[in-house]
Amino acid sequence: MDAKELLNRYAAGERDFRLANLRGIVLSPIDLYRSSDAPTLILANLNQHQHRPYLIGANLSGADLTKAHLSRANLSKADLSGANLTGANLMAASLSGANLSGANLTGANLAGCHLNWANLTGAILPKANLAGADLSAANLTKADLGEANLSKAYLIKANLNGVNFKDSCLSLASLKEADLTEAQLTGSELFKANLAGANLTRANLSKAKLLQANLRRTNFTQAYLNGACLSESDLSEACLDRANLCKADLSKTYLRNITLNGCHLSGINLSGADLGGVDLSRKLLTGINMAEALLNEANLSGAYLIEANLSGAYLSKANLSLAYLIKADLSNSCLHEIDLSKANLSKANLQKADLTGANLRGAILTEADLRGAKLIGAILPNGTVFRH
């Protein structure tokens, strides 16, 4: 069937073109939409071995294209709003600037598809394959991408406000400067994803996997990260104000110059993390794991570190004045020139800790274990300097 026959049959009132062979058809610019009478092209084949089907600017609003073969088709600026593309093959198709708002793309193959500047507002895309697709600057506000495959996809500066990414795969995807405000990312896979400068305000990342992700300057204000894995990620200059990080894994993360105002950190794993210069003053860090963490020049004054694990941590020149370190483990830690004035170290483990030049003036050391500790030049609780 060529374009002329299709249009003649359409003009005659025919709307059902299921199983039609439309290989190599050129329909641009056409209008296949009349009021509520949308065409049915179920299982239609619009492919040709050597030529791409051209549907540039075509109006297929509300069309039924279930399982249609549209791979490599040029649908740039086409209107597919409300269309049914369930199970359709759109692999490597061009949909730049297309209108797919409210379209049903459940299980569709959009791998390598060009969707930059496309409108996918409210689109239904669960279990869709968007691997390697370009969605840069696309609008996906409140779209459903649950369990979708977006590995290696480009979503740079995309509007992903309120999008459902639950259990989806975004590994190696680029979401640089994307707007993910209130996005649902529970259980999603973001291994080595680039979210630098992205906005994740109030986003839900509970139990999400962000291993080795680029999260520089990312905004996590009021985000839910409870149980999330951010191990080995770069969070430098990120904003985590009022975020929920309960039981999150931030081991070996880079956290320099981050803000943590009013955030929840109970049960968090910060072992091996780089927190140099970070302000954790007066934070509730009871039982926290900071083993082998880099905390040089960090501010932990007045922090609650009861039963915290700081074994092997590097705390040179850190401020822990007035900190609560009852039963804390500081064994084998580097505490060079640390300020522990008026800190409570009752029953703390300081075995083999290096307290050279430390300030312990007014500190409480009741039942603290200092076996093997180095105290040369340290100011002791009574104000005297240890010389031996």
Locations of regions flagged by a protein language model:
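Tandem repeat scaffolds
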Residues: 2-388
